[in-house]
């Protein structure tokens, strides 16, 4: 079994990376392979609604979207992580996932998904809801928890202290 984790945060050792590394370590203990793909460090163009992905099965833009879809074909589940920017998921992960799901939704259907959001204080539930909609519109079971999957802090250290 393999789970693909997507980091939409801009910092390589930031709050989202810390949260996803924690998830990855728990998966490893459970005997589940995982891979973290980081997209927050590069510009991600939004979907322009051209429809070529419906015909070609991939986005015409040659960036990480098509490579992520290829990885998704071999994975059994997904976890998307994003910082909260103005009460929403990051622009990078939103643009990325819009194009991923327009281009390759068939490779996600029926596979479980979860998300984790990182914020200093507020906006987390709106961003959490936004990311979960990618799962629900695509017939993916949403992995639930006893509380919303969120971390609070402005640094790696603060996230690790967030109990």
Spans of features found by a protein language model:
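Generic structural signal for helix capping and beta-alpha/helix-loop junctions
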Residues: 13, 44-46, 123, 152
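Glycine-rich phosphate/pyrophosphate-binding loop and the adjoining helix
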Residues: 1, 29-30, 67, 141-163
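Helix-loop-strand module that forms the ligand-binding subsite of alpha/beta enzymes
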Residues: 60-144
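N-terminal beta1-alpha1 ligand-phosphate binding loop
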Residues: 2-32
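Cysteine-cluster motifs in flexible loop/terminal segments that predominantly coordinate metals
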Residues: 42-72
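A short beta-strand-loop structural module common to alpha/beta enzyme folds
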Residues: 32-42
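Conserved beta-strand segments of alpha/beta enzyme cores
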Residues: 33-35, 58, 141
């Amino acid at each position: 079994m393999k789970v693909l984790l997507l980091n939409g945060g801009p910092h390589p050792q930031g709050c989202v990376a810390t949260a996803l590394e924690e998830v990855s370590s728990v998966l490893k203990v459970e005997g589940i392979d995982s891979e973290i793909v980081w997209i927050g460090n590069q510009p991600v163009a939004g979907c322009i609604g051209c429809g070529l992905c419906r015909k070609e099965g991939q986005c015409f833009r040659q960036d990480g979207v098509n490579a992520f879809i290829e990885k998704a074909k071999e994975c059994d589940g997904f976890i998307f992580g994003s910082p909260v920017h103005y009460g929403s998921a990051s622009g990078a992960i939103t643009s990325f996932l819009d194009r991923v799901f327009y281009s390759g939704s068939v490779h996600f259907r029926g596979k479980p998904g979860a998300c984790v959001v990182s914020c200093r204080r507020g906006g987390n539930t709106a961003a959490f809801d936004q990311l979960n909609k990618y799962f629900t519109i695509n017939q993916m079971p949403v992995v639930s928890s006893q509380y919303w999957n969120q971390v609070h802090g402005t640094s790696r250290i603060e996230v690790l202290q967030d109990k």
